[in-house]
């Protein structure tokens, strides 16, 4: 409030020049500027933001020495504005001028003032020389001079002292004569150093070796501490056969090798020829011991094999994998194919009711399953040794892979069959299998599992597909048959791949049995024909036709209208949604009433019967 009162008392022409223009002032930003701004503006003056030419520079007298130290400009004290406002008249600004410029002063005046550069006295030079005399190598660095400044050797800065020494005092220090002080030398001690002690010990050992041929036993005891302990492999190895009297044991040979290594390092050159002569003997002994160990390992493996064969006599007939792999594969494949065709034809002659049943399980079975059943087929085909081979656990494990199954099936036979050729042996096996099949069918005709296909598959099987099916199944069977020849006893039913199409058609016509499932399949065929006809009439795909049937609740006429003319909500009514179907199947009475009010009772019953039909 006081500042506003003062500003109101100031005349508006206080800071106008004789021409009637407002005076311009410049003050550095700060509290002083905030104080003077209302006074200058109320008096008619202007306060510039930047320093402009012709503007009066105002400055606080307390800040004049710090701000305008090196400038020669003319500054007016802020007291000028305050005095003009107090007296309410324009005063002369030159009376308040503050001129701070570079002034020329003498050395003596600077010394009296206590500021500026001072000269060096003789005492200061002597102190510098005395301090730097012992540190001449560090004189060109900075650390020594900084330390002198810390210790206050002189009142000058460390840069000044360094400059003084390098320019004026360094020559004086070089001209000074240096006095050599007598250095006290320590008396020489003739005690032996640890390195010399080692050399003396080595020389003494060499001399002892040269003088007398020491026995190998004490050397082995000395080097025993250096040698590493025996490996666990040596400790766990089985006991070897007794060696000859002239040959040392393996442990002694190893020790002798360790001894030779130590002697080569420690003994002088005169001992080297003798050691080189002993080295071949040790190596020969070591190689002979290795050969003996291999022989013992072989004998142990043969003994273990013989013991296994004694425990499992059937395993003797199983050959090695290398012998099995060398046998020809193509002949084996041909024999397997002929065996399967002959056995199937004989079965079909005996049981004609099973000809029309397609064997889809054999098509969908994996190669691994066919490999597992192939092992059982050889055992059922009349080979007694094959039956015994499955009881052997080692034989079953060996037959896990497809290659091993082929080896065991082809080569696990009697000694008489080995003499015969492959084709003759296969024919003999087929005869035995036919005999076994006849006996088994007469005793237990119901034991053979018959895999009946689903009704949907039977109904969808048209004559064209029945003709194509044997060809595709035959190709698939030829691919899987060489790897895994399956027996007829283990298969779910006879495959239609081998049966001709004429047999299929004739047997299917002569052996038709009327069952509820077959009637259902007939209904399914009729529905299928109707859907195909609807697709032809409307020229729509199966997806569109199926959607229309779902909308029409299975009504073919309404579905045809939907496909041809489209759906109209006003004429056809609301459509059933998935949520409506779920509520209908839930059979909640309250929700059923809502559905009946929405669709009508007839439509609800029709939809319910449509959703309840289970077509397989």
Curated annotation (Swiss-Prot):
A motif (Nuclear localization signal) lies at residues 597-613. SUPFAM superfamilies: BRCT domain, Homeodomain-like. The keyword Plastid does not apply. Residues 174-518 are annotated as: Disordered. Residues 232-245 have a biased composition (Low complexity). The keyword Cell membrane does not apply. Residues 271-288, 344-358, 468-480 have a biased composition (Basic and acidic residues). GO terms for cellular component: chromosome, telomeric region; cytoplasm; nucleus; shelterin complex. Residues 246-255, 363-382, 397-415 have a biased composition (Polar residues). Residues 112-169 form the Myb-like domain. InterPro entries: BRCT_dom, BRCT_dom_sf, Homeodomain-like_sf, Rap1_C, Rap1_C_sf, TE2IP/Rap1, TERF2IP_Myb. Residues 15-98 form the BRCT domain. GO terms for molecular function: telomeric DNA binding. It comes from the Eukaryota. Signal peptide: none annotated. Keywords: Activator, Chromosome, Nucleus, Telomere, Transcription, Transcription regulation. Acts both as a regulator of telomere function and as a transcription regulator. Involved in the regulation of telomere length and protection as a component of the shelterin complex (telosome). Does not bind DNA directly: recruited to telomeric double-stranded 5'-TTAGGG-3' repeats via its interaction with terf2. Independently of its function in telomeres, also acts as a transcription regulator: recruited to extratelomeric 5'-TTAGGG-3' sites via its association with terf2 or other factors, and regulates gene expression. This is Telomeric repeat-binding factor 2-interacting protein 1. The gene is terf2ip.
